[in-house]
Amino acid sequence: MKLRRKLFAAVSSLAVASAVLLAGCGAPAQDGTALKETGTLTLSVNPEIQIEYNRDGKVTALTGRNDDGKGIVEAYPDYIGKDCEDVLKDLIVEINEAGYFVDDIDGNKKNIVLQLEPGSVLPSDDFLADMSASTQDAVKGLNLSSGIVTIDDDDYDSAYAKDGKPSPYITLEKAQEIALTQANVEAADAVFDDKEFDHDDGTPIFELEFTANGNEYEYDIHAVTGKVVKAEHKTAGTQS
């Protein structure tokens, strides 16, 4: 009789444990561990536009992150369900028609920054590269010469990650790449004499000074968006 009771107790405990295990498998993951089913790609020229897309790469929402971006989004209402690369091309056309590529930065056309939010779903392994290629096609089609810079998960400085959240700041190396692209300078030709990370009036900025081919450059890069905030250079042989 005692043996039967022990056997029954053991079987009951096993059943309870199995039920708990199965319930855990069927329960939704906690917010911190759930896999994202959407992604966010931000396009920055002067307008900053946040593009939200689903696992299939279809656009679900557009949001202007500054006043210029809001104006572009208002002028482009027909985007829901379109492929992300097609929306990017359309936005480049809209931005060009609005005159944002007219002004140069330090003698060169403005960079186009494509920034992928950390943890975003990737419809394909080459998603960001494909978006960059589509943007480049749009740029060439408009006879523009803007450089294109991409920012993905590997380009955020892990030293500033905390509380399980990714760092909001790009790395110094990415800031240097952005500066060189805007200046139209090859990395092999550049020597960085000064590089500081500072909060200028509350804005996180990389302050960079470098020389290339005898010219002296001073560039400020926004540490969150990757936008060029300041850009100037002194040509070799000219006076200060």
Question: What are the functions of these language-model segments?
Answer:
Residues 2-12:
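Bacterial N-terminal signal peptides that target proteins for export
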Residues 5, 67-72, 76-97, 102, ...:
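Charge-biased, low-complexity intrinsically disordered regions
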Residues 20-24:
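C-terminal motif of bacterial Sec signal peptides marking the signal peptidase cleavage site
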Residues 26-29:
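Bacterial signal peptide processing site
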Residues 35-40, 46-48, 54-59, 107-111, ...:
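Extracytoplasmic
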Residues 45, 51-75:
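Post-signal-peptide N-terminal segment of Sec-exported extracytoplasmic proteins
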Residues 84, 88, 94-96, 166-198:
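Short, non-transmembrane alpha-helical segments in secretory-pathway proteins
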Residues 117, 125-130, 135, 185-232, ...:
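Exposed beta-strand-loop-beta-strand "reactive/processing" segments of non-cytosolic proteins
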